[in-house]
Regions:
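Conserved catalytic core of two-component histidine kinases
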Residues: 87-89, 133, 143
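A short, flexible helix-to-loop-to-beta junction within the catalytic ATP-binding CA
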Residues: 23, 78-83, 128, 135
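DHp/HisKA dimerization-phosphotransfer hairpin of two-component histidine kinases
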Residues: 1-44, 88, 95
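Glycine-rich nucleotide-binding loop
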Residues: 93, 103-104, 135-142
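A conserved short beta-strand within the histidine kinase catalytic ATPase domain
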Residues: 73, 81-88
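Helix-loop-beta hinge of the Bergerat
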Residues: 25-62, 67, 71, 75, ...
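ATP phosphate-binding glycine-rich loop and adjacent ATP-lid/helix-beta elements
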Residues: 109-140
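Conserved catalytic submotifs in the C-terminal HATPase_c
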Residues: 46-58, 90-91, 99, 134-136
Length: 151
């Protein structure tokens, strides 16, 4: 049990330090996501990134905060061994997919919106997007964000 606590603590520290400078004016989303996954020692992480046009710094900030919260939830509430981030650009929107392969070991039902999931929903709503959660073969968060007029 102590090993688990130490691992969780180390993982949380790594994630916190990786996003310490979220307010940097020149954040590169792909590089920052790669760094987050590299520092995410709790399980193996992968990134699929297919975005050609730049996102606004505010959108990048929101996406990074959502990813950080999702990673924290995976560490705290699942026994996942794999975690993936997919960011895709479509003609009218951006798509963010966050997945893990775990099964929940928390006593709280997945449908219960804790603070973390509620914060994600609020961020997505602030960007006029949509959030959908499924729990088949792990836990998946699907987010669709409309493109901004100006990045």
């Amino acid at each position: 049990l102590q090993n688990l606590r130490d691992t969780l603590s180390q993982g949380m520290d790594n994630v916190r330090s990786s996003v310490h400078d979220l307010h940097d004016d020149a954040l590169d989303l792909q590089v920052t996501l790669q760094r987050l996954l590299k520092d995410y020692s709790f399980c193996d992480g992968t990134l699929e990134y297919d975005v050609l046009h730049p996102l606004s710094q505010q959108t990048i900030y929101h996406i990074l905060a959502i990813v950080k919260e999702s990673m924290n939830n995976t560490m705290k509430h699942s026994n996942a061994t794999k975690y993936s981030i997919t960011v895709r650009e479509q003609p009218a929107f951006y798509q963010l997919i966050l997945r893990d392969n775990g099964t929940r070991h928390s006593s709280v039902p997945w449908q219960t919106r804790g603070i973390g999931l509620s914060n994600m929903q609020e961020r997505v709503a602030d960007m006029h997007g949509y959030l959908n959660i499924t729990h088949t073969s792990g836990f998946q968060i699907y987010i669709t964000l409309p493109k901004e007029d100006k990045p």
